[in-house]
C-alpha cells in the first residue's frame, strides 16, 4: 500500500479533529446545562405532584362515630371515679335519698329501742342486786333475833333497869333500828293472822285482839322476817 495514514503532530488541536468534534470548554458547558435542566424538572415534579388518592381514601374511610365513642368511654370512666369518691349529683343518686333517710330512721329507732332495753336491764339488775342484799341482811338479822328475845325477858324480870347490860341492850337495839329492823306485837293490837301466830284463843266475841305477847315479831325493810307469837283475847271494856 502506497497510501498511509499520517498522525498529526498535535492530535488534540481542534483543527486536527473532524468537524463533529466537541471542544473541551463546550463539554463543561453542556454538563452544567444538563444538571440545571434535570434539577428544574425534579422541582417542577415536586410542585406539580397531585394528592395521593390512597391517603385521601384512608381519610374518607374514618368512622364518624369514633370521636363520640371515645367521649362516651371517657365519661364512663369519670362517672366511675365520682361513684368511688361518693359524688352523688346524678338523678339516680338523688332518687336514692328517700331510701337513705328511711334507713337512717330505722337505725335511729333501733338505737332508741336498744337504749331503752339497756336502761330497763340496768334497773332490773339494780332491783335484783338490792333484793339479794336485803335477803342477806334479813338472814343475819334473823340470827340476831334470839338475842333480842333474851333481852326482852331480862327486861321483864327487871334486869335492864341499870348497869352495863342495859347499856348494851340500848346500843344493840338502836343498831338494829338503824338497819330498819322493826318490832311489832303489843297487847291490845288487833289480831292479824298474816303476821300473828296464835297459840291460844281466849276470846268470846267476834272482835279479837292480842291478849299476851309471848314473842315479838319483826320486820326488815317492811318485809316480814318473823311472826309474833300471841294469845288472843277480847278487847278490854
Curated annotation (Swiss-Prot):
GO MF annotations, alphabetized: adenyl-nucleotide exchange factor activity; protein homodimerization activity; protein-folding chaperone binding; unfolded protein binding
Signal sequence, renumbered to the chain = none
Write the protein's name.
Answer: Protein GrpE
- The UniProt regions of compositional bias labelled Basic and acidic residues, in chain numbering, are 55-65
Report keywords, A-Z: Chaperone, Cytoplasm, Stress response
Q: Name one GO biological process term.
A: protein folding
Q: What family name appears in the similarity comment? A: Belongs to the GrpE family.
**Organism source for this protein?**
Corynebacterium efficiens (strain DSM 44549 / YS-314 / AJ 12310 / JCM 11189 / NBRC 100395)
Where does it reside? Answer: Cytoplasm
Query: What NCBIfam families does UniProt report for this protein, alphabetically?
Result: PRK14164.1
Q: What does this protein do?
A: Participates actively in the response to hyperosmotic and heat shock by preventing the aggregation of stress-denatured proteins, in association with DnaK and GrpE. It is the nucleotide exchange factor for DnaK and may function as a thermosensor. Unfolded proteins bind initially to DnaJ; upon interaction with the DnaJ-bound protein, DnaK hydrolyzes its bound ATP, resulting in the formation of a stable complex. GrpE releases ADP from DnaK; ATP binding to DnaK triggers the release of the substrate protein, thus completing the reaction cycle.
User: Could you tell me which PROSITE patterns the record lists for this protein?
Assistant: GRPE (PS01071)
Annotated spans, Disordered: 1-65
Chief subcellular location equals cytoplasm
What's a GO cellular component annotated to this UniProt protein?
Answer: cytoplasm
Describe, as the record does, how this protein assembles with itself and its partners: Homodimer.
Amino acid at each position: 500500500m502506497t497510501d498511509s495514514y499520517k498522525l498529526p503532530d498535535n492530535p488534540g488541536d481542534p483543527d486536527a479533529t473532524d468537524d463533529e468534534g466537541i471542544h473541551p470548554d463546550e463539554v463543561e458547558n453542556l454538563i452544567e446545562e444538563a444538571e440545571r435542566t434535570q434539577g428544574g424538572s425534579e422541582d417542577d415534579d415536586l410542585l406539580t405532584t397531585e394528592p395521593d388518592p390512597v391517603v385521601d381514601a384512608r381519610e374518607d374511610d374514618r368512622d364518624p362515630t369514633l370521636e363520640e365513642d371515645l367521649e362516651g368511654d371517657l365519661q364512663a370512666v369519670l362517672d366511675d371515679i365520682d361513684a368511688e369518691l361518693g359524688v352523688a349529683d346524678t338523678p339516680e343518686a338523688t332518687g336514692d335519698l328517700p331510701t337513705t333517710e328511711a334507713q337512717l330512721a330505722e337505725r335511729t329507732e333501733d338505737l332508741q329501742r336498744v337504749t331503752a332495753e339497756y336502761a330497763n336491764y340496768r334497773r332490773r339488775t339494780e332491783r335484783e342486786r338490792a333484793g339479794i342484799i336485803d335477803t342477806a341482811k334479813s338472814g343475819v338479822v334473823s340470827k340476831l333475833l334470839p338475842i333480842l328475845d333474851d333481852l326482852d325477858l331480862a327486861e321483864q324480870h327487871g334486869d335492864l333497869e341499870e348497869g352495863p347490860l342495859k347499856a348494851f341492850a340500848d346500843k344493840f337495839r338502836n343498831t338494829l333500828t338503824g338497819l330498819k329492823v322493826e318490832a311489832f306485837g303489843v297487847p291490845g293490837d288487833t289480831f292479824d293472822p298474816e303476821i300473828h301466830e296464835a297459840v291460844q284463843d281466849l276470846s268470846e266475841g267476834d272482835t279479837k285482839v292480842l291478849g299476851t305477847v309471848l314473842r315479838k315479831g319483826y320486820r326488815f325493810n317492811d318485809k316480814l322476817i318473823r311472826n309474833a307469837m300471841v294469845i288472843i283475847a277480847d278487847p278490854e271494856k
